[in-house]
């Protein structure tokens, strides 16, 4: 091949030079782990995972990444934040190329509506939307849930739509016998009008797009990860 494009995350690029030594390599570099001022020490309200085991695990992961950077002719990453997780020696070799957003579809749509239980929700409504694959602290679920009482106090006619599942994500598992979704929702459910809050679970693509199109506010929260 003239060009091989690959992801450096789990060692996929490590041995390709052994097979095709003359080929040009373009590496998609997603994230470089840091031991300070990073995801592992960001949120002391949930956990501060700076144990020796975690630090050594991240050093070991980075060692694989570094071996792949060494054989890369070019490196790309989607955002400036991701580029900034790398040391200067590597940052100077990385180009930021955004993955793109289809703004012909992902934009407000006055004709779109979403049926949720007995409600038909559209752009005329106040809609606060949170979307994450996993509803977990790593993606700010706990912070969002804690904000709902104030949101509904100021806007009692708002709809709160939450899309995402209970499966394991990037962070630690919840306490045994519960989910992150249940744990944090239980902390606020007696303080709010729960008829305004809808957990939609994992939805198909059409419903996801419609939710984006009718949202007044789309909330995205995350650890620095």
Residue ranges and their predicted role:
Residues 73, 210-225:
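Acidic donor-binding loop of glycosyltransferase active sites
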Residues 67-70, 185, 204-215:
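Short acidic alpha-helix that forms the nucleotide-activated donor recognition element
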Residues 164, 168, 172-206:
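Nucleotide-activated donor-binding/catalytic signature segment of Leloir-type glycosyltransferases, i.e.
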Residues 81, 100:
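Carbohydrate-associated surface elements
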């Amino acid at each position: 091949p003239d060009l091989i494009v690959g992801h450096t995350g789990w060692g996929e690029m490590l041995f390709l030079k052994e097979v095709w030594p003359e080929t040009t390599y373009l590496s998609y570099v997603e994230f470089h782990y840091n031991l300070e001022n990073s995801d592992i020490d960001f949120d002391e309200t949930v956990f501060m995972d700076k144990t020796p085991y975690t630090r050594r695990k991240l050093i070991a992961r980075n060692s694989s990444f570094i071996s792949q950077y060494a054989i890369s002719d070019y490196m790309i990453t989607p955002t400036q934040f991701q580029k900034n997780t790398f040391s200067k020696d590597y940052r100077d070799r990385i180009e930021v190329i955004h993955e793109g957003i289809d703004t012909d579809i992902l934009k407000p749509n006055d004709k779109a509506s979403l049926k949720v239980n007995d409600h038909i929700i559209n752009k005329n409504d106040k809609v606060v939307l949170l979307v994450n694959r996993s509803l977990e602290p790593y993606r700010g679920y706990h912070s969002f849930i804690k904000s709902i009482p104030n949101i509904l106090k100021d806007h009692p006619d708002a709809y709160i739509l939450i899309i995402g599942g209970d499966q394991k994500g990037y962070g630690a598992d919840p306490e045994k016998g519960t989910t992150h979704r249940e744990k944090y929702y239980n902390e606020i459910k007696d303080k709010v009008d729960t008829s305004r809050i809808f957990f939609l679970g994992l939805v198909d693509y059409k419903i996801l797009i419609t939710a984006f199109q009718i949202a007044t506010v789309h909330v995205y929260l995350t650890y620095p990860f």
